[in-house]
Amino acid sequence: MRLALLWALGLLGAGSPRPSPPLPNIGGTEEEQQASPERTLSGSMESRVVQDSPPMSLADVLQTGLPEALRISLELDSESHVLELLQNRDLIPGRPTLVWYQPDGTRMVSEGYSLENCCYRGRVQGHPSSWVSLCACSGIRGLIVLSPERGYTLELGPGDLQRPVISRIQDHLLLGHTCAPSWHASVPTRAGPDLLLEQHHAHRLKRDVVTETKIVELVIVADNSEVRKYPDFQQLLNRTLEAALLLDTFFQPLNVRVALVGLEAWTQHNLIEMSSNPAVLLDNFLRWRRTDLLPRLPHDSAQLVTVTSFSGPMVGMAIQNSICSPDFSGGVNMDHSTSILGVASSIAHELGHSLGLDHDSPGHSCPCPGPAPAKSCIMEASTDFLPGLNFSNCSRQALEKALLEGMGSCLFERQPSLAPMSSLCGNMFVDPGEQCDCGFPDECTDPCCDHFTCQLRPGAQCASDGPCCQNCKLHPAGWLCRPPTDDCDLPEFCPGDSSQCPSDIRLGDGEPCASGEAVCMHGRCASYARQCQSLWGPGAQPAAPLCLQTANTRGNAFGSCGRSPGGSYMPCAPRDVMCGQLQCQWGRSQPLLGSVQDRLSEVLEANGTQLNCSWVDLDLGNDVAQPLLALPGTACGPGLVCIGHRCQPVDLLGAQECRRKCHGHGVCDSSGHCRCEEGWAPPDCMTQLKATSSLTTGLLLSLLLLLVLVLLGASYWHRARLHQRLCQLKGSSCQYRAPQSCPPERPGPPQRAQQMTGTKQASVVSFPVPPSRPLPPNPVPKKLQAALADRSNPPTRPLPADPVVRRPKSQGPTKPPPPRKPLPANPQGQHPPGDLPGPGDGSLPLVVPSRPAPPPPAASSLYL
């Protein structure tokens, strides 16, 4: 096999090497520095890089810095392949903390150590399922996987860094090595397919934590034996980087990224008591992590790597379902292989236990890709053949179940110190200056992101990699992006200016949950009933108190308060029995985690009543350091909870002290801040909000609008009656607008009327009169006027109180003014004498016509 590095693209990172602090020189023997290969060599290669100049050796390229993008052509089994690589910026997202010790024991801390990022990730052109993980720190080392059935390792050649050795993965046999999950296993995380699907759909309605990217902040600790095996400190750093790179590659398909935030090397002596018993070593390491490492270097998981051989076939041990726990999130691993692939696979296995992954079931229920009879799944209980490269579907389902049950809240947080130092488009992480990053062109599926520029496409507001973005548009501020999963979880809402959901915030330790059956611890609500259901399925409940107490006070495989560092079972004190092994009844016949090793039944008598008790011995694997014990925070009595597997007062968790600053109107979250009740203002919940809520305001406005509409409708329905009532209230002023069918009562026809002619057109009256009643049909004939002249005026009633223009009374006989035009001849009398008006001295009585009167004539026309 022959490899040639043809050209490098995007030399954004090329330049002078970054300055680094002086590293310790440990020294060592030649035997310690040289290790014989454990596989059959398949060939060698000479690495050369061609840029814009003639070909250069890799060593010459490293003198000026590493390119951020590489394109490599190589031959594998006489076939030409092209690798497309980018620096893995997620591996070292910031400047990690490097710790070592001087001969006098002084701790040397280099925060923000300028560790050269010499590791790359990528894929092989033309192979969609391929992946590549290479480091070029000093020579080329790494892994090339074309398919689940075909993969190659690249190792350093003996004595020549420029001639890496290629071998097939199938040649890396790790005979007799097994894993040992720790005895401290907490909550079962694997379920049968039927139950898992039922729970899956129920939980997906609440929260989708599976598609969100999780980040494990990792610290690797090298003990003194590991330091002496690699006395060149830079070589130790390179090996650590290579292991972390493979870890990140293994977990990436699960949407979990591994970020190396620190490396501690015990350069002078070990800081804990070492032991070949992995359980004892794990207990010592976790105690040191909790009291020494964690306070000065925040992280999510710590892994100890040692050359010390473990007793038996085990190569590692960890705590089941312990991620984010300050007490149990860690593991111990034996550096059992010269190949970094074997060590990285072992660390990935133990880290998987911390994430809630159980061993893969034997047989075909959890098939692993790879050629028979080799096994290539990371969570296989035994690595009798080759190191695992992938996680099975069972592991995927177990991780999803653990996340949906509230595990791993710390994985959704990203510390500001982890911000990348520069931008690199295509690394699937949004670096400074980028708006999005969907990876390589052939793997980018985001319609909102331009994979060539890592900028949003025109019209897009966000990239679809976050829950706060839909169809390239941002959800508004306040949109629920992460609903709570249990009583200890708090909802998160979109900020309105980002596609990412804020960090997962949960209730603080000691806050009550599950109706008082437990308190929140490390963001989880662990009631005894829920723990039984997680182990034995729906319907499972805590065992009877007598059965529980009897089993856990005996101190054997069926009941105890855990194992001592020496491996023996410890009986529980009567006060602590609720904090020991889980004792359940009912549910399924087979557990969802592990397998039943043995069963024991016994009839107990209490107060004259016989009680049938049944206990089981669960086999969780050799790498599980403790039996299934009750989770911290489980209620064990009034005001008492399990802390450190002992029943202690809940006040020790400090919830009351934290709650005081919320002044009785809120609770504390995991960040130590008050979450105020509705109607109270943060940050201390002292001020009561007086403003009416928007919902109340909207309801009031709606009711007011409805009332207005009802009034308008009633007014329209009764409009006729209302009009009549208004006329009555106004009196006579309304009569001129009243309909003709209802005229106001008027006096009878007057005895005198205005003399008018009988033409076709209406004549002009001598003075304005208001319209009231019809005019007389015919004027009075002149020959009758003399007979009526001496008749007295008839009595009249007063007119309505309307303004009427009247003429002043004349002193002479009343006579209508002559018209402008000559009047026609008087018609023959057609009216009876009684209907004619008589003469008089006064004013003529007003006669109201039936039609509107014409406008009054000008004053000059009234008299001729």
Curated annotation (Swiss-Prot):
InterPro entries, A to Z: ADAM_Cys-rich (IPR006586), Disintegrin_dom (IPR001762), Disintegrin_dom_sf (IPR036436), EGF-like_dom (IPR000742), MetalloPept_cat_dom_sf (IPR024079), Peptidase_M12B (IPR001590), Peptidase_M12B_N (IPR002870), Reprolysin_adamalysin (IPR034027)
Pro residues bias locations: 741-750, 768-780, 814-825
Any one annotated GO CC term: cell surface
SUPFAM superfamilies cross-referenced by the UniProt entry: Blood coagulation inhibitor (disintegrin), Metalloproteases ('zincins'), catalytic domain
Membrane topology per record: Single-pass type I membrane protein
Other known facts: Mice targeted for deletion of the first 27 amino acids of the ADAM15 N-terminal sequence are viable and fertile, showing no major developmental defects and displaying normal mortality or morbidity. These mutant mice, however, exhibit significantly reduced ischemia-induced retinal neovascularization, choroidal neovascularization at rupture sites in Bruch's membrane, and VEGF-induced subretinal neovascularization, and develop significantly smaller tumors following implantation of B16F0 melanoma cells. Aging mutant mice exhibit accelerated development of osteoarthritic lesions in knee joints.
GO molecular function, one term: integrin binding
Gene name for this UniProt entry: Adam15
Cysteine disulfide partners in this protein: 324-410, 366-394, 368-377, 481-501, 658-668, 662-674, 676-685
Protein name per its UniProtKB record: Disintegrin and metalloproteinase domain-containing protein 15
Note describing how the cofactor binds: Binds 1 zinc ion per subunit.
Glycosites: 238, 390, 393, 607, 612
PTM annotation: The precursor is cleaved by a furin endopeptidase. An additional membrane proximal site of cleavage affects a small percentage of the proteins and results in disulfide-linked fragments. The prodomain is apparently cleaved in several positions that are N-terminal of the furin cleavage site. May be partially sialylated.
Extracellular side: 208-696
Transmembrane region(s): 697-717
UniProt domain Peptidase M12B: residue ranges: 214-415
Induction: By hypoxic stimulus in retina (at protein level). Up-regulated by VEGF in retina.
Residues covered by the EGF-like domain: 658-686
EC number of the protein: 3.4.24.-
Function: Active metalloproteinase with gelatinolytic and collagenolytic activity. Plays a role in the wound healing process. Mediates both heterotypic intraepithelial cell/T-cell interactions and homotypic T-cell aggregation. Inhibits beta-1 integrin-mediated cell adhesion and migration of airway smooth muscle cells. Suppresses cell motility on or towards fibronectin possibly by driving alpha-v/beta-1 integrin (ITAGV-ITGB1) cell surface expression via ERK1/2 inactivation. Cleaves E-cadherin in response to growth factor deprivation. Plays a role in glomerular cell migration.
Residues reported to bind Zn(2+): 179, 349, 353, 359
Biased composition regions of type Polar residues, renumbered to the chain: 34-45, 752-762
Cytoplasmic face of the membrane: 718-864
Organism: Mus musculus
Motif position, SH3-binding: 816-822, 851-857
